[in-house]
Amino acid sequence: MAEVIDGKSVAEDVVRTVKALTAELVAKGKAKPGLAVVIVGEDPASQVYVASKSRTAKECGFHSLQHTLPAETSEEALLKIIADLNADPAVNGILVQLPLPAHIDAGKIIQAIAPQKDVDGFHFINVGKLGTGELDTAFVPCTPAGSMLLIQRVRGKDLSGLNAVVVGRSNIVGKPMANLLLAANCTVTIAHSRTKDLPALARTADILVAAVGRPEMIKGDWVKPGATVIDVGINRIPAPEKGEGKSRLVGDVAYAEAARQAGAITPVPGGVGPMTIAMLMANTLASAYLAAGLKRPTF
């Protein structure tokens, strides 16, 4: 059976480190990191997620700021708030919780965030820096950054020569994940819905990353023996065994089957999920260090 990669434990390590480095920054007479979270509307899942981000920011010793705006907020009003946050030296990270209401252009909002405060890593400048290997000053999207940390906990920092297959080509996970693996000297293939003979391709992977949003699509016999499997998917499926109308969370990988083949695998829940908020804190801390003229910490 595969080693189970405990994302919750690694995320707790990251948060502990962020907390300690925040205390060091303040001890040097610098301002504590500031994270501003902006939420528009009353989507219940977004509310829960934002509350968790704000709570973790406070735990890290950050200055935590939250703007909760009504669903009818205009694009112009939201852009004004972002401009104010861009100009505020007490704010190092700005995060706009997605999705936004239909009348607001999410792309326009994200590109309005100052790149040095774009701790989600979605601004074109940060995307470009990641794509060209400028990792010293880039902010990497939190889910792939967290996934990479989990891979390195198993495989070490140097991944030279390993074959990596990323299933999924989204701008939020698939593409940045592939760029991170390239930067670590992997041989990388990106697969997607049009890929021919995906099972055969997946079997070549020493590192297999699943980020397609299809429940248990990747079967056990798609996994190379000893591979490291990172399951980014979070899917809710019916669970009649729990009672009528009940559901359960599964990933994009058929976990029980894959765990018999893999060398190491992330569970769902408890794998990649906890890493996302932890890496948001790491990015905010890095922004504060860079703003103070200090070398950013690495994780």
Curated annotation (Swiss-Prot):
A biological process term (GO) from this entry: purine nucleotide biosynthetic process
Positions with a binding annotation for NADP(+): G168, R169, S170, S193, I234
Gene3D superfamilies: Leucine Dehydrogenase, chain A, domain 1, NAD(P)-binding Rossmann-like Domain
GO molecular function: methenyltetrahydrofolate cyclohydrolase activity; methylenetetrahydrofolate dehydrogenase (NADP+) activity
Pathway listed: One-carbon metabolism; tetrahydrofolate interconversion
Source taxon at top rank: Bacteria
Functional note: Catalyzes the oxidation of 5,10-methylenetetrahydrofolate to 5,10-methenyltetrahydrofolate and then the hydrolysis of 5,10-methenyltetrahydrofolate to 10-formyltetrahydrofolate.
Protein name per its UniProtKB record: Bifunctional protein FolD 1
Provenance organism: Mesorhizobium japonicum (strain LMG 29417 / CECT 9101 / MAFF 303099)
Lineage, uppermost ranks: Bacteria, Pseudomonadati, Pseudomonadota, Alphaproteobacteria, Hyphomicrobiales
